[in-house]
Amino acid sequence: MKLGFYPKLAADSIKKNKKLYLPYILTCCGISAMQYIMFYLSDYTENSGMTGGRIITTTLNYGIIIIVIFSIIFLNYSNSFLLRRRQKEFGIYNILGMSKKNIAHIYLWENIIIYLISTVSGITMGIAFSKLAELLLARLIKDNISYDFTLNKDLVLVCAAVSAFIFLLLFVRGIIALWKLNTLSLMKSENFGEKPPKANYLIAVIGVLMLCVAYYIALTTEKPLDALVMFFVAVILVVIGTYMIFIAGSVTMCKILQKNKKYYYQKDHFVAVSSMAYRMKRNGAGLASVCILITMVLVMMFGAGSLYIGAEDSLHTTYPRDFTFVMYAGGDQETANENFNVFCNDIDEFFINHNDNRKDIQKYTYAHYNMNVTDNVFDRGFDKPADKYAEVYFISLADYNKYCGENKVLEDNQVLINTIYTQYSYSNLIIGGESYVIREFVPTDDLFPNRDKAYLTPKIYIIANDINKIISGFDNEITHHTKFIYRFNSSLSQDKQCRMFNDLYNNMVANNNRGKYGSGTSWAIESLAFDRADFYGIYGGIFFLGIILSALFLVATVLIIYFKQIAEGYEDESRFTVMKKIGMTNREIQKNVNSQMKTVFILPLAFAILHLCFAAPIIMRMLTIFSVENTSLILITMAVIVAIFRVFYITVYKITSNVYYEIVSKSKI
């Protein structure tokens, strides 16, 4: 055969089947563009000096892995669908004298043509939109914006190589599938339909039970660490349960409707129900896949959106003041207090020299221990099970009243307490052999920021008149476990605070090296302005990745729906032809189409929203790890995301229903 025979035949086949191949090629273009953008941003954030670049690069690299894996899985599904639609055509080639080797040549050139078109177009799109993506990322992480345009040739080659690898896998998978078929199966494969399965109540009930268990987990899991683990257990149960309900439950529903003769034998319902029942097993699996993808998009955008929108609240919760200084002092209590005063005086001098009028100053001391808590007895023993331990904080009543705006009064044998991630139901507590009456439970967030919750261990805060007296009963090295806190807000701009942070740190290091703060002393500095970059690097990077992955899953959802509707349209074409011959008009056909399509489309969206509503509590528990706890803001974010997606979904419904109708009616609407 002539050299250009196979490429020409492959190109003609693609043109002839453009209704199938155009969405597929556009999807491949979009995936190639996303891959290039992710590679570009990963390289840019690593080498450009962008604030929080290291964290963002790591986040984007995880995103690249997810995109490549999902691309392989999804394009394999799409390619399998195209092969199924093309097998009759390949069968004709076989009857006309072509061997499977010849057909493989055609299939090879089809893949080469699609690869070249999609990769060149996709990378071109990626290059064109890479700067826009960079600007979006810079805005999300609140970094300086650069309008310089760069083209990295190495990234173009890497992206082309990744796409080539994916298409090679698709080609090998397709050749194996074609090689297993004989001429008769090639000719009839398009007509092979799955037999209507019998209603399986057992599978449907198991599916419902799985969803109930998953919902129960989501509603009852309290601790963020448990939520992080149990969330994935719930996800697995939801995925399996959804498939069971859509496959078995939808079949059962159709069988029940068919038994209802008054309903079933109306012309508005007869065609829709019978056609759905004929292929319901495959239809149910397809609907379940769409439902899972929609749920992934909603959950991802809900979580990432809530995280980013609540970032500023989270930042100020994590850093209650612009500057926080923590000192761990050695020596006896008196010496430790003297060293802390010297430490604070140096800080004061530094900020005065920088013309900073500080405000909202807090200066206090607390003791921190890991203790065994058995019933109402607190001790320092380490011979108990791990679940009996808690972090216990001791702070003086004077400091509590001063910085929490209270005026509490306690007797020497009385204490105030607060607990996180543990329940304490006793009216007293015993420490060092002494019993103390619990007067009341009080909030302590003004002294201990909510970020301490991220450590996920049980915490008990104890406020007393004299904490040294309490802890002296079980600790001879009191200062070894004592922390001195000095924090305040700055009158300087965020930029000035960032610029002077390194000078401040170096000044404190120099003083410490000279032994100015005593032996055995260590300290730490926290700056809200300086740490903001890394903070938004994490939150902005996660939100950006959520946007990219959601876009990818949306493309997959649309293409699955589109392919599904084309397949069902061709399968229903002969049935509607019969209906037209017995007198059904195009208007009646469209009415039947709408009846079927509304049923098919509303179920995945309805179940996805249901999944999201039950997932919201456990997602909110996980968000507390990042100190995002504004419930009203989180719920508003969820409502907005659902509303936006609903509009998008309805648009997809209208487009795909028109495609389906054009096929079954053989006339334009």
Language-model features: locations:
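Alpha-helical transmembrane segments
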Residues: M34-Y62, G241, A248-V251, G284, ...
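N-terminal Sec/SRP start-transfer signal
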Residues: M1-S32, P196-Y201, M210, I245-I294, ...
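Peri-transmembrane interface segments
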Residues: K19-L26, I37-I66, F81-R84, I92-Y93, ...
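Basic-flanked hydrophobic alpha-helices used for secretion and membrane insertion
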Residues: S314-V555
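Short helix-loop junctions at transmembrane helix boundaries
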Residues: Y40-R54, I123-L155, C212-V229, P604-S667
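Short cytosolic juxtamembrane segments of multi-pass membrane proteins
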Residues: K2-F5, K180-E194, Y570-E571, Y661-I669
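Hydrophobic alpha-helical segments
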Residues: E110-L257
